[in-house]
Amino acid sequence: MSSECDVGSSKAVVNGLASGNHGPDKDMDPTKICTGKGTVTLRASSSYRGTPSSSPVSPQESPKHESKSGLEPEDPSADEWKLSSSADTNGNAQPSPLAAKGYRSVHPSLSADKPQGSPLLNEVSSSHIETDSQDFPPTSRPSSAYPSTTIVNPTIVLLQHNRDPASERRAGEQDPVPTPAELTSPGRASERRAKDASRRVVRSAQDLSDVSTDEVGIPLRNTERSKDWYKTMFKQIHKLNRDDDSDVHSPRYSFSDDTKSPLSVPRSKSEMNYIEGEKVVKRSATLPLPARSSSLKSSPERNDWEPLDKKVDTRKYRAEPKSIYEYQPGKSSVLTNEKMSRDISPEEIDLKNEPWYKFFSELEFGRPTNLEKDLSFCQAELEADLEKVETVNKSPSANSPQSSAVSPTPDITSEPPGYIYSSNFHAVKRESDGTPGGLASLENERQIYKSVLEGGDIPLQGLSGLKRPSSSASTKVDRKGGNAHMISSSSVHSRTFHTSNALGPGCKHKKPLSAAKACISEILPSKFKPRLSAPSALLQEQKSVLLPSEKAQSCENLCVSLNDSKRGLPLRVGGSIENLLMRSRRDYDSKSSSTMSLQEYGTSSRRPCPLSRKAGLHFSMFYRDMHQINRAGLSLGSISSSSVRDLASHFERSSLTLARGELGASQEGSEHIPKHTVSSRITAFEQLIQRSRSMPSLDFSGRLSKSPTPVLSRSGLTSARSAESLLESTKLRPREMDGMDSGGVYASPTCSNMADHALSFRSLVPSEPLSICSDELDHCSNVSNDSREGSGGSVHGDFPKHRLNKCKGTCPASYTRFTTIRKHEQQSSRQSDWRSDSRGDKNSLLRNIHLMSPLPFRLKKPLQQHPRQPPPSDSSESPAGQKADLPCHDPQDQPHSAGKPQVPTRLSSRHTMARLSHNSEPPLDRPAGLEDCTRAINNGNPVPYSDHGLDRNNNPQSELAAAHGDSESPRHFIPADYLESTEEFIRRRHDDKEKLLADQRRLKREQEEADIAARRHTGVIPTHHQFITNERFGDLLNIDDTAKRKSGLEMRPARAKFDFKAQTLKELPLQKGDVVYIYRQIDQNWYEGEHHGRVGIFPRTYIELLPPAEKAQPRKLAPVQVLEYGEAIAKFNFNGDTQVEMSFRKGERITLLRQVDENWYEGRIPGTSRQGIFPITYVDVLKRPLVKTPVDYIDLPYSSSPSRSATVSPQQPQAQQRRVTPDRSQPSLDLCSYQALYSYVPQNDDELELRDGDIVDVMEKCDDGWFVGTSRRTRQFGTFPGNYVKPLYL
């Protein structure tokens, strides 16, 4: 065994050739050397000469070969080398050391279409390529399927397992499989050479065309072949040769033991031959292998009851399909790696998380759906379906030999094959064509179904692959935690929803096998999940409770399913299968008109539905599911309370009203949709909720009573029509006029003329979407003034009035608004056809389909009160006519005004109404019934001329008054008969708006111009620098504008009255109370001044000039008689911050005049005009001055610290701290006395404490707004804020 290991490890594959078994190194036969560009010279090795050409040999035969290797002559050795080269070139050599170490094989797995012999790089077969290289494709095969080595690496096994089919195919085509005795006989090589020379089997055309030789016959390198080799190598490296059960996440079962039947992925012929070879040569017969997972077992070899292989196969992450035919959805994708705890069916989804479902379920049923009951049904339902399918499937599947292919059913034959969502549709197609028979048995199918029930995988073809004549195919439903990321071909694409005769006669009694139950919530959004078909009458009574809890059910289905399902009516499975839907609608013709949606009504009258309109039908059916409302059950007088639940419960009584015969003659047929079912159910519920939540009008007694009075009071109202009603032809409703009463709706000539004028005016005054906000337009989307408008006691008067649409925000139909407007504008010319006969066809116009239009196109007609003549056919309407003549003088005639709060009178509306009533004169040909229409408009609001025409919400008294009271914004109702005056009114309104906007723009522009002019400082150059530092008396005095700088005597102080924020660098920011010193006046609006050492400009209006007595000026010294001057020397440089401070340099001699206080001296520098005060700590006092005053300063201990304001310790006597001269205590002319306005607590040592009312003698006013002075109360000297005091003489 060790020798065999050495044999396997010593062989090296260089460019695809095995280096060995050639002869001694000295016998360098040029015919045995591969030459050419880029080739590698290969020499024959003297060792292991007798190794046979076919690499795999059994362990028992290997010693025999080695013993005979030394006995063979040179020629047979060369022939053996040629055989070995040919075998290695075609991928049948022993594994290389790299392969033994676990690396991937670089030998290609050739396709069945190109059985080329040598795709490797250097294309070397032998020197006799013209004779022998073509005669020796890899034909010799041992009985062993694995290499003769004890190092059984799984990668080696897999590589050999992948390479065997190609050689077996060629061996099967060209020569029978030889036995081991034949291969190991001494004369076997020469015998096969002679036999193959006689047969001269030619290689493929590609090999003949690609192989080129030189004059000696040595094959040259072919660049194209090299590229092909690289391509093949790349594909081989990235190819995943999965066995059928290697990927538990994507099951691909073969339901047959027939190994000729292809599996789900199209196999090459070599792979099929390998499957055949597995019958003859079993792997276990040749070499004992270590325990491997089931990924290396064939499908027939694996036990179906064996547990699933859960080992991670990393090859699937490198899997790439080589062609579109091998593409399998979900493979090598993120879905492969996703693991779910268990399968989720739509019944298990918590519908309470859906806001719309929670709201409407509570609104209609009073409590949420009992989901626990639904979930208990779901488990039993699936098991029952599987058992029934198994039972039904026994006889047909026994007769059907083909078990692994999906054949198209009659339901999908009309669809294009591209719609079939099968993971291997093309492969299935090929297999169904190329597999005439199989060995499928009932036991195999039964085991598959048991595996499914036990938690196993359902095949990708679905259970429909077993040719069962039951309902639609199912996906894997694994309740044990397995993956279920693949949806069968019938569950995702709704075009092939019924893939197995779902509508066929044999399976109408069965429910679909949970086709939409697996992972729908993980793949599709909640609103677009496919819904299940409705079960028929056999299973409906037990399982109908499951259907209302589906994820994507509409509100109509939630409340109608219990009623309609008992009649076997199928619910919608999605808007995209309308052909099947319409077919099932025709099968079940018993669907009532109240539950049949309007789009179905439209499509049934225009069959067959064209395929080009599928996209529109998708949206319309989905929209209808969300918005359809059944209004037939809400009869007048049947509701005693006004609660929302009571009102909503009456929307569900369509079947009762049909049974009572309360519908009109034109609404009795199942194919006709009554006009009162037009508006959206959700819209009505939103109206009820909005009314109950925010509007005070909850008195429905007038509208819900059987008295025709409120019905007749709405005679002037016009209907809000959707865009579809404008675009749809009237000939689609030929039978609607048959059911009309003899006394028509608009029997009154006043109303007829009014309608005629409104219709004629309609095209000239289109609805302007920009002038009305979207919320306003939403309110009047589906209001329909139907035929019961003028027949209060007739059969139409029993139905409720339609409420305004408030479908806002998330409504999908709101996005169709603009296109609907454009379609109406483009087709406005077509309206002239039915405008002429609007009186007769008025009812048919009201019966149009209101599906997708939240935006109405109202007839431009006033909503008002005017006299109306009662129809001659109905005498019960005469009180209503008399009531209409007197516009609501009696408070009892206002049923909707009761309970509403008083609204303040809109005086502006009445002024405008009065102006309109005087300015807009009606034409002479105006009907007499419209005398009061002139004052119907006020900024889009219907405002009658008197209080009697209004309810308490200032809305007209009509049956729609409550609905119009819900509107938060005005409506644009224009008198239909005043064409000219209306245009003038619109133009006048437009002009008024333009004038108002022009005035506002003008005022704004003037203000901006004034601001710009006021801040035009481009020519203003400040006389000083922006910032003034302590060095301003030095360098700043050297600038050219020194003359412009005013002295402290010339600068006038001013105080800021308001805060001023600078907007440019030239402006000086001020706070209220700041004292600024004005340098100059720039213009009549701006000053230039200084504040806190910064120079800038500020507005004149922001400051107030201080009186001349408050000028900041150097303090005139008191007439003090100096007896003896003192003397001091400066220790430091001192820069004065104010005008009274004296600056000096270190070392200068200073003459002391007097001591101001304990911290400051007053002095001058001899020989200069500089005089002022300075801190004591900055100088060394050599001699103190003597001043003749009534009270002299005592000798105070002064500190030599550099602090400018060193304070005496509190332990010193009070007299020593506050010793002042008598002229300080007496206000002199040189000092300004101020009175404190506020109290001030000192923050620093040199600050003065102030109390409200204190008198302070100010000696200095600093330019930063601080004053220096002495308090008369405390006799202390210090600084304090200037805005805390006021002049005493004021």
Curated annotation (Swiss-Prot):
The modification Phosphoserine is found at residues 55, 58, 62, 185, 204, 209, 254, 261, 270, 345, 376, 407, 432, 969, 1201, 1209. Residues 202-247 form the SoHo domain. Keywords: Cell junction, Cell membrane, Cytoplasm, Cytoskeleton, Glycoprotein, Membrane, Nucleus, Phosphoprotein, Repeat, SH3 domain, Transport. GO terms for biological process: acetylcholine receptor signaling pathway; cellular response to insulin stimulus; focal adhesion assembly; insulin receptor signaling pathway; positive regulation of D-glucose import; positive regulation of glycogen biosynthetic process; positive regulation of insulin receptor signaling pathway; positive regulation of lipid biosynthetic process. One of its GO terms (cellular component) is cytosol. Expressed in all tissues tested: heart, brain, spleen, lung, liver, muscle, kidney and testis. Expressed in 3T3-L1 adipocytes but not in 3T3-L1 fibroblasts. O-glycosylated. The modification Phosphothreonine is found at T51, T179, T475, T1189. Residues 83-95, 123-153, 392-412, 595-606, 704-722, 1211-1227 have a biased composition (Polar residues). SUPFAM superfamilies: SH3-domain. One of its GO terms (molecular function) is protein kinase binding. It is found in: Cell junction, Adherens junction; Cell membrane; Cytoplasm, Cytoskeleton; Cell junction, Focal adhesion. Gene3D superfamilies: SH3 Domains (2.30.30.40). Residues 1-211, 238-271, 286-313, 389-416, 463-482, 588-607, 697-739, 783-803, 822-841, 862-972, 1198-1227 are annotated as: Disordered. Residues 1049-1108, 1123-1184, 1229-1290 form the SH3 domain. PROSITE patterns: SH3, SOHO. Plays a role in tyrosine phosphorylation of CBL by linking CBL to the insulin receptor. Required for insulin-stimulated glucose transport. Involved in formation of actin stress fibers and focal adhesions. Interacts (via SH3 domain 2) with PXN. Interacts with the long isoform of AFDN and with VCL. AFDN and VCL bind to SORBS1 in a competitive manner and do not form a ternary complex. Interacts with ABL1, CBL, CBLB and INPPL1/SHIP2 through the third SH3 domain. Interaction with ABL1 occurs only after insulin stimulation while this has no effect on the interaction with INPPL1. Interacts with the insulin receptor but dissociates from it following insulin stimulation. Also interacts with SCA7, PTK2/FAK1 and flotillin. This is Sorbin and SH3 domain-containing protein 1. The lineage of its organism: Eukaryota, Metazoa, Chordata, Craniata, Vertebrata.
